[in-house]
Amino acid sequence: MAALDGLPPLRDVIQRHGLDARKALGQNFLLDLNLTQKVARTAGGLEGMTVFEVGPGPGGLTRAILALGAKKVIAVERDARCLPALAEIADHYPGRLEVIEGDALKADFESLAPEGAVKIIANLPYNVGTQLLVNWLLPKAWPPFWQSLTLMFQKEVGERIVATEDDDHYGRLGVLCGWRTEARMAFDVPPQAFTPPPKVTSTVVHLTPRKNPIPCSVANLEKVTQAAFGQRRKMLRQSLKPLGGESLLVKAGIDPARRAETLSVEEFCLLANSL
């Protein structure tokens, strides 16, 4: 992509700005510009879109998003060392890149969103990725301000996101994602694509909001899944005892002898609505 956007190779950018990835910030920089384009393309058409990015680092994915025609990228970066490298990209794409220095967990993304839906594309820092996803799934207003999420996680997290009942990876995250989105794993990214190479394979997950998820209280769904999966090997009559146990299950029409991993998203919503 260096030839396409006229900017130097990422390795040169990292060396020139002294950007060693820091474990404390959950950083692993994706250097392969062909892969960053593949990530950006997974989000679908970007022409005229506003895109939010978290943890752009030296800007490899940022460059891919801009090169594919995004109208504007709003990037939240906590590491001040990366700002000069991102400023060079902003100069190359005048008016199309806004960088906000700060903690993405504290950012109010919805207030930053322009009129019309946005897409969120990010190689998420490993230490905050799951919490950010949960934050984006929990707004009371639905459909949300975002049109799609295209996010990179450790593969184990990706498997939890797309898992359904009777899957070993199924848990609270799978229920939440299955309730409000349609999620798929797009492709894996090997450790050697990053600097420094992480110990595990990564995966890109693409999520789109369900227009009409089952009406259900977020707070009640959280209570039910926390209790059920907190003791996932026990029968539901035991794990849900603090919430009413057998009487709650009978009210929802669910066999009290079943276990959490056998319940569908719809059945968890039934339980939440029976509280």
UniProtKB/Swiss-Prot annotation:
It is an enzyme of class 2 (transferase). GO terms for cellular component: cytosol. SUPFAM superfamilies: S-adenosyl-L-methionine-dependent methyltransferases. S-adenosyl-L-methionine binds at N28, L30, G55, E77, D103, N123. Keywords: Cytoplasm, Methyltransferase, RNA-binding, rRNA processing, S-adenosyl-L-methionine, Transferase. One of its GO terms (molecular function) is 16S rRNA (adenine(1518)-N(6)/adenine(1519)-N(6))-dimethyltransferase activity. It comes from the Bacteria. It is found in: Cytoplasm. It holds the Pfam family RrnaAD. SMART domains: rADc (SM00650). Its EC number is 2.1.1.182. Its main location: cytoplasm. The keyword rRNA processing applies. The keyword Transferase applies. InterPro entries: KsgA/Erm, rRNA_Ade_diMease-like_C, rRNA_Ade_Mease_Trfase_CS, rRNA_Ade_methylase_Trfase_N, rRNA_adenine_dimethylase, SAM-dependent_MTases_sf. It catalyses: adenosine(1518)/adenosine(1519) in 16S rRNA + 4 S-adenosyl-L-methionine = N(6)-dimethyladenosine(1518)/N(6)-dimethyladenosine(1519) in 16S rRNA + 4 S-adenosyl-L-homocysteine + 4 H(+). NCBIfam families: ksgA (TIGR00755). Belongs to the class I-like SAM-binding methyltransferase superfamily. rRNA adenine N(6)-methyltransferase family. RsmA subfamily. Specifically dimethylates two adjacent adenosines (A1518 and A1519) in the loop of a conserved hairpin near the 3'-end of 16S rRNA in the 30S particle. May play a critical role in biogenesis of 30S subunits. This is Ribosomal RNA small subunit methyltransferase A. It comes from Rhizobium etli (strain CIAT 652). The lineage of its organism: Bacteria, Pseudomonadati, Pseudomonadota, Alphaproteobacteria, Hyphomicrobiales. The gene is rsmA.
